[in-house]
Amino acid sequence: IGSCISLYEDELIFSSNMRNENLPDEFNRYDFDIYSVDLKKNKKIAVSISRLNSVNNDLSGSLYYDGSKLMYSKFNNDNFDIYESLRKDNNWTVGKRKMGDELRGPNTENDEFFTSYDPPEVKVYFITNGGYSGNKDIYFSGVKNKERNIWGGAQSAGIEINTNYDEGSVYIHPDGKTMYFSSKGHDSMGGYDIFVSEIDELGQWGKPVNLGYPINTIYDDNYFVMTADGRTAYFSSNRPSGNGGYDIYKMKYKGDKKLMLSQSEDKLFSEIKPIASLKKENVAKESLKLLTIFRGKVLDKVSLKPVEAEIKIIDNSSEN
């Protein structure tokens, strides 16, 4: 569950309660740990990210678009809170930094998990059971002081998004205006379904649209994430065609409007042994709108302080 992918689909991070080094509970169930898969390799092997895992449940949340940091949730003191780990020298740091403290930010005495970054990096979206409905809802918090790690109080994503039923996951696409989320409400076929909503000029999320079959079924379909080019996505489902519990499925975008599963319904088996190889299918050639994230600072040569600047980007491979 909790699939996270890098911008160009070279890494997959997820959580699983597969057999691990910790002891199972009285029902022979193992705690959730966080794993990483290098999608560039032919053999898809799930590797435990040991610095993030504990004897309690650890849930992956959101991999930043450039792969430089990861939000995840840890179970401590009877509730889940949000943590962040940074990637340094291709290794993850111990997630010591919480996204806010107490009621100043996302982390409260309630559960906060299954997070999502937004591209400007001024908000954190997450699932919480601390909303007004008493169910799991989608909330967000805005940063007030990034250096001091102070975040504003949690706010609901809006009445168009949250329902009287549970919302299960949220993902903000790199375009910054598209939200994919799961819900048992709206016009769900049954259990969790995956929906899409777009934000308007006033910053309000619009009426959600059900992605439809075969993505959604009468079973639970959840934890949807998509690549930057909008052509490939991963999600989890407990449909009968899987191996029991939640399995991770990969799908291809085929056509202008609808997201379609590949006919073979390639799934990533949540096991410690090599994950099943993904089949590369031929996709019809059509023009794609590619997204490039450009980040950096312009500094004064003497003072080394940030200065205002105008940057021009020229594509030598085209006439634009």
Where are these regions (language model features)?
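Short, conserved micro-motifs composed of acidic
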Residues: 1-297, 302-307
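Short amphipathic beta-strand segments in non-cytosolic proteins
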Residues: 310-320
